[in-house]
Amino acid sequence: MSAIIEAKKQQVDTIAEQLKNSVSTVIVDYRGLTVAEVTELRSQLREAGVEYKVYKNTMVRRAAEQAGIEGLDEFLTGPTAIATSTEDVVAPAKVIAGFAKEHEALEVKTGVMEGNVISAEEVKTVGSLPSHDGLVSMLLSVLQAPVRNFAYAVKAVGEQKEESAE
């Protein structure tokens, strides 16, 4: 086999492994963005722990097939970049949805969450959700509220009894 074909097979294997290991993937069309804007997007994604790469559509198509992800073919037209995260489910969608609001040239094509293809609208919806840490803190504040309110009530009753005792 020629070295070029071997290199392409290796790249397909790498992309397939990346798709299998990621908890969420967002596929975008970056056409129309300036180099500075793409650099800014890459920087924001890197800070969020998201890997962002541009691949040829045929490579992604073969890698998706190898990874067992069906339904991506219709979205793999034109320039394609893939943002994947192995840790935070919301991070790629959050960063890209926020960036797309500021830069209309960035078009969300589709996403993959837990092996299922989701629409661009669903990616934007996921992007509007708080992060895992944000959700945990919201849950904790909801759980603490009754205890905190009870403590305030006990304190108020205690202060009221002190005033009446004087």
Curated annotation (Swiss-Prot):
Gene3D superfamilies reported for this sequence? 3.30.70.1730, 6.10.250.290
UniProt GO BP: translation
> Which is a Pfam family this sequence falls into?
Ribosomal_L10
Q: Which GO terms describe its cellular component?
A: large ribosomal subunit
Keyword annotations for this protein, in alphabetical order, are:
Ribonucleoprotein, Ribosomal protein, RNA-binding, rRNA-binding
User: Which Gene Ontology molecular-function terms are recorded?
Assistant: large ribosomal subunit rRNA binding; structural constituent of ribosome
List the CDD domains hit by this protein, alphabetically.
Ribosomal_L10
Q: Which InterPro entries match?
A: Ribosomal_uL10, Ribosomal_uL10-like_sf, Ribosomal_uL10_bac, Ribosomal_uL10_bac_type, Ribosomal_uL10_CS_bac
Residues passing through the membrane, by range: none
Q: What do we know about how this protein assembles, alone or with others?
A: Part of the ribosomal stalk of the 50S ribosomal subunit. The N-terminus interacts with L11 and the large rRNA to form the base of the stalk. The C-terminus forms an elongated spine to which L12 dimers bind in a sequential fashion forming a multimeric L10(L12)X complex.
Q: What does this protein do?
A: Forms part of the ribosomal stalk, playing a central role in the interaction of the ribosome with GTP-bound translation factors.
Family per UniProt? Belongs to the universal ribosomal protein uL10 family.
State the protein's name: Large ribosomal subunit protein uL10
Q: Tell me the organism's taxonomic lineage.
A: Bacteria, Bacillati, Bacillota, Bacilli, Bacillales
